Design a protein with these regions (language model features):
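SF2 helicase/translocase NTPase motor core
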Residues: 1, 5, 12-25, 38-40, ...
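SF2 helicase motor core recognition
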Residues: 108-110, 159-160, 314-316, 352-370, ...
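Conserved helicase ATPase motor motifs in RecA-like P-loop NTPase domains
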Residues: 146-159
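A conserved SF2-helicase RecA2
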Residues: 379-388, 392-462
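Conserved Helicase C-terminal RecA-like lobe
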Residues: 22-26, 32-33, 40, 47, ...
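Short, conserved loop/helix-junction motifs that constitute active-site signature segments
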Residues: 48, 113-118, 141-146, 366-368, ...
Length: 462
């Protein structure tokens, strides 16, 4: 296997960390998505065989990890610990160089992976253990190993405390994180970005749109209903002396307003179901959908990825497009994901891949696409960066163009889209501070001012 120069640098750095006599043996591999972190890790495993290696990953990429190890180091024996018929014998782990295991198995009552001492533990997409109160975090902390690696492009997934949790897994305490962040960054974190390597540039653009009058009318209705409901809930919460008792209900109201901005039919269907009424079809226009379709039509010689929040909007887009369309959403099996990916990569240049953000942010290598559309902004900038990284990665031959479609609001009815983008900026600032990567502040363009979660809740002036 021939590595790129930045990958050789990464492998050498990791081997130095594993042989270090000072501090924890391991650290953070935080390369930006798409720079080949897996290839670097497999090379380290191959060059420093020191007992069995445990690789813990999201369930959706267990098979991909197994395949990548076979591809990059066929001499390594790989054992997949997953499925109904998985082994109950911990000694099986010691008979293989690498064991790949999903995070879900860490939460068993007596996890089998706790029964042996591993040479190395790798947590891929390590933000999965960011909650220190979760069973996943507590179980991961109990895994015994000589070397410990955290692998993620987003060590600050929601807040800086996420990073504190990941440091704890490595063996770095909270006080050290608070007092010695710069030292930790220099010694224990390696991060390279695509701008510094031979990957074509990625262009980001927020496309701000005015809603059509009929959309504005529906949004005003949804906003006003949410505002009234939230005000009433806040009064009840205050009377009970419990300010958080209606948090989920408040978020549901926020979601309804958001649905109008994604695709109005979602809101109409949701209200009909709630009121047990007959569903009516949305007959109005959608500026966001029209802009999406027009933009796709302007680039018939490039493959396109469309990232959506809701399956309902995916259904509409799939119905309207006349080009070849492929799809991954939260209901897709592992086999379906793999077949859709393979078919898209073989498909004509005008093909479109519809991907639900929560289902397609990990484990997909789609360098054949060079146009990306995000129909609704995500709460977390890291989620969007992961999605974009599916095509803007090592092996990409074209420049990648990313467009995020955002509806504008007004003083009376503020835009949910704009509020989420503002929140992204706040989180991007935290990313930049922890990773020492100023580029992250502008990688996902947003408004100039940030917005806290409490301010998001107050968007309805309730």
């Amino acid at each position: 296997m021939e590595l790129y120069p930045h990958q050789i640098e990464g492998v050498n750095w990791m081997l130095e960390r594993e042989h270090s006599s000072l501090g924890p043996k391991g650290g953070f591999l935080c390369d930006e998505m798409g720079l080949g972190k897996t290839a670097q890790l497999v090379t380290v495993i191959k060059r420093n065989k020191t007992g069995p290696t445990l690789v813990v990953v999201p369930k959706s990429i267990v098979t991909q990890w197994k395949n990548e190890i076979h591809k990059f180091a066929p001499e390594l024996s790989v054992f997949v610990y997953d499925g109904i018929k998985r082994t109950r014998d911990a000694s099986e782990f010691q008979r293989h160089d690498v064991t790949v295991c999903p995070y879900s198995l860490l939460t068993e009552d007596t996890p089998l992976v706790h029964r042996i001492e591993w040479g190395r533990v790798i947590l891929d997409e390590a933000h999965e253990i960011r909650n220190r109160r979760s069973k996943r975090f507590k179980s991961a902390m109990k895994i015994e190993s000589t070397y410990r690696w955290v692998v993620t492009g987003t060590p600050v997934f929601n807040e800086v405390d996420d990073f504190v949790s990941l440091c704890a897994f490595i063996g770095i305490g909270r006080v050290d994180v608070q007092c010695n962040l710069e030292t930790i960054r220099e010694k224990f974190i390696i991060r390279r970005t695509k701008n510094k390597d031979s990957i074509p540039e990625c262009h980001f653009e927020n496309v701000e749109l005015e809603m059509y009058p009929e959309e504005k009318t529906l949004y005003a209705q949804a906003f006003s209903e949410a505002q009234e409901m939230i005000r009433e809930m806040m009064k009840r919460a205050k009377a009970h002396g419990n300010s958080t008792m209606y948090n989920m209900d408040i978020l549901e109201q926020f979601l309804r307003a958001r649905q109008v901005m994604a695709w109005p039919q979602l809101y109409i269907d949701g209200m009909a179901k709630k009121l047990d009424e007959e569903m009516n079809a949305w007959t109005g226009r959608s500026k966001k959908m029209e802009t999406l379709f027009e933009s796709i039509a302007q680039h018939p010689d490039e493959k396109t990825l469309i990232f959506c929040q809701f399956k309902g909007e995916m259904n509409y887009i799939q119905e309207k497009l006349t080009c070849p369309v492929f799809r991954i959403d939260g209901t897709c099996s592992k086999e379906r994901r793999e077949s859709q990916l393979a078919e898209f990569n073989r498909a004509p240049q005008n093909s479109v891949f519809l991907i639900q953000v929560k289902a397609g942010g990990q484990g997909l290598n789609i360098q054949s696409a060079s146009r990306v559309y995000i129909t609704s902004p995500s709460w977390n900038p890291g989620t969007e960066l992961q999605a974009i990284g599916r095509c803007h990665r090592t092996g990409q031959k074209r420049e990648v163009y990313v467009k995020k479609l955002i509806y504008k609001g007004d003083e009376k009815y503020p835009s949910v889209d704009e509020s989420i983008v503002a929140l992204q900026v706040t989180k991007s600032m935290e990313y930049a501070r922890v990773l020492g990567d100023e580029r992250l502040k502008t990688q996902l363009p947003g408004k100039s001012e940030g917005l806290s979660i409490s301010e998001i809740r107050n968007i309805f002036r309730a």
